[in-house]
A protein has these predicted regions:
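Interhelical loop and adjacent transmembrane-helix boundary motif
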Residues: 73-76, 80, 232-295
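Transmembrane alpha-helical segments of polytopic membrane transport and secretion proteins
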Residues: 1-42, 306-318
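Amphipathic cytosolic juxtamembrane alpha-helices at the membrane-cytosol interface
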Residues: 111, 116-120, 125, 188, ...
Length: 318
């Protein structure tokens, strides 16, 4: 008689164990399915990029030779090159970096370390986030009215650099803030405990420890800017240019010239756009070669960001 009451709880416990095991097995199946779907989505993106990159490589590599990098554009596709385009891209990126990096890093540091948390900073943060999603051609329209006409910079390298600096500024600000947020509070408290001022703490501790994340954001932003076409076309960049801007370096004191800032220019995406609009297949091959070079430059910049982040984080420990 006493065995019956004991058997009932044992059977109930066994049933509960089986139910839990079935639930765990179900969750594992869903985990497996979700992981498989994620891998499939990743492979679609990677394979699509690989196919496009391979197509550009197959078409463009035969055109890659020293003359392609040292010749100006030409009506004859076999003689055309990207000299003015890659020089223009380089100079525009220099202006972009000089403007965007100090402003972006400074704004990020202020918002995280100095700015009070109130409705004003909340509005600023929301606007920064929204600016990151604004179509690039809107920046081009803004630059056309402001830099080209209002400030009188004209259709120049300076206007292009300032336009792209505005474009990547939200990226640099967000990257700076995220990097600073990752620093433990104990770093700041230890610095203040030793009598350091807020500026000394930022200069000697916050910025060095967050440099990996900041550099990553800056390089990724620059990699985006180098491939932009819409804002550069909007401000009036040339699609055909057979001369180089004035040299930034001179043979006489002060050995620096800023005339190049106001020179007409072209960049690699616009040169590609010009070639793809031509009916001749040889120009399309030139566009593929220029695209291959541009993708390699972008991959190199992203690879540099990953390497710098790894090296800096390896050397900085807390």
């Amino acid at each position: 008689m006493s065995a019956l009451p004991q058997a009932a709880p044992a059977a109930s416990a066994h049933h509960d164990v089986l139910a839990i095991r079935a639930l765990i097995a179900k969750h594992k199946r869903w985990d497996y399915i979700f992981g498989l779907l994620g891998l499939l989505a990743l492979m679609v993106g990677v394979l699509t990029f690989a196919a496009l990159f391979a197509e550009m490589a197959i078409q463009g590599i035969p055109r890659l030779n020293p003359d392609f990098f040292t010749n100006f554009p030409s009506r004859r596709p076999e003689q055309a090159g990207i000299l003015s385009a890659w020089v223009g891209s380089t100079l525009v990126m220099i202006v972009t970096a000089i403007v965007a990096v100090p402003l972006g890093v400074g704004a990020g540091v202020y918002l995280e370390e100095y700015g009070s948390k109130n409705w004003v900073t909340d509005i600023i943060e929301i606007n920064i986030t929204n600016l990151a999603g604004v179509p690039s051609i809107v920046y081009g329209l803004l630059a056309l009215g402001l830099f080209v006409y209002q400030f009188g910079f004209g259709q120049s390298i300076l206007s292009a650099g300032l336009t792209l600096a505005l474009l990547i500024l939200p990226v640099v600000i967000v990257a700076t803030r995220e990097a600073i947020r990752g620093i433990p509070r104990s770093i700041r408290e230890g610095s203040y405990a030793l009598g350091a001022t807020q500026w000394q703490t930022v200069k000697d501790h916050i910025l060095p420890y967050s440099s990996a994340g900041i550099l990553t954001g800056v390089i990724i932003g620059m990699a985006r800017a180098i491939g932009e076409t819409a804002p550069i076309i909007t401000i009036g960049a040339l699609t055909f240019i057979a001369f180089l801007p004035a040299s930034p370096v001179t043979a006489t004191p002060p050995f620096l010239s800023f005339e190049w800032l106001f020179s007409p220019f072209s960049v690699m995406p616009i040169q590609m756009f010009n070639w793809t609009s031509r009916p001749e297949a040889a120009f399309h091959q030139n566009a593929a070669a220029a695209g291959f070079v541009l993708v390699l430059m972008t991959l190199a910049m992203n690879g540099l960001a990953i390497w710098l982040r790894y090296r800096l984080r390896k050397n900085l420990k807390w």
